[in-house]
Regions:
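A positional/architectural concept
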Residues: 2-77
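Flexible hinge/switch segments at interdomain interfaces of large molecular machines
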Residues: 35, 45-62, 93-97, 105, ...
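Alpha-helix N-cap and coil->helix boundary residues
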Residues: 31-33, 94, 131, 135
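Positively charged, low-complexity, intrinsically disordered RNA-binding extensions
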Residues: 99-186
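Short, intrinsically disordered, mixed-charge
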Residues: 23, 81-89, 120-124, 134
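Glycine-rich active-site/cofactor-binding loop and its immediate structural neighborhood
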Residues: 64-92, 97
């Protein structure tokens, strides 16, 4: 396999790790309402687990309120139950036609817990990026050993993958800093 191809595959895989991290960060609660908070909340919709956004309209009319309007009004109870069972710590208010979720202010203690979660998720993403780098390094060494690439090309490839890794880790750190600031903002 060509070095360029290896590096391109590595970059694609690293970008997927970063996209996954962004998705994880979107579902972490801050003091503000966001429809992404409900992404992982699943309800039992006629026997199959479905995300809430596939059975209802979700809107954010105010910075600290989410309104869920199910298309099928009989699903209100199931949606309410799923939200209560989730780890979001939100209490749904039901008026018969829609569910209102008021996002309470986060306590200082809860903010610190959330920051720890942010750090852990960022660290997991860094580990994933480093594992991709290791895979490419191993592939380069294998190619060099098989004499399909020269020693100079292998060393050049190692330098390039390290630069790519450093850039992606920097990007992860920037995302982490933004999310941390968002969580700690009162």
């Amino acid at each position: 396999m060509e070095i360029k191809e290896l590096l391109q595959q590595a970059e694609d895989r690293m970008n997927k790790s970063i996209e996954a991290l962004k998705h994880e960060f979107a579902s972490i609660r801050t003091g503000r309402a966001s429809v992404a908070l409900l992404d992982k909340v699943m309800i039992d919709y006629y026997g199959s687990p479905s995300p809430i956004n596939q059975v209802a309209n979700i809107s954010v009319p105010e910075p600290r309120m989410i309104v869920i309007a199910p298309w099928d009004k009989t699903m209100i109870g199931a949606i309410e139950k799923a939200i209560l069972q989730s780890d979001l710590g939100l209490n749904p208010g039901n008026d018969g036609a829609q569910i209102r979720l008021t996002i309470p202010q986060l306590t200082e203690e809860r903010r610190k817990e959330i920051v720890k979660v942010v750090h852990k998720k960022a660290e997991d993403a860094k580990v994933a990026v480093r594992n991709i780098r290791r895979d490419v390094n191993d592939a380069l060494k294998k190619e060099e050993k098989a004499k399909t690439i020269t020693e100079d090309d292998a060393k050049d490839g190692l330098v390039q993958i390290q630069k790519l890794t450093d850039a992606k880790i920097k990007q992860i750190d920037e995302l982490k800093a933004v999310k941390e600031k968002d969580v700690l903002e009162v």
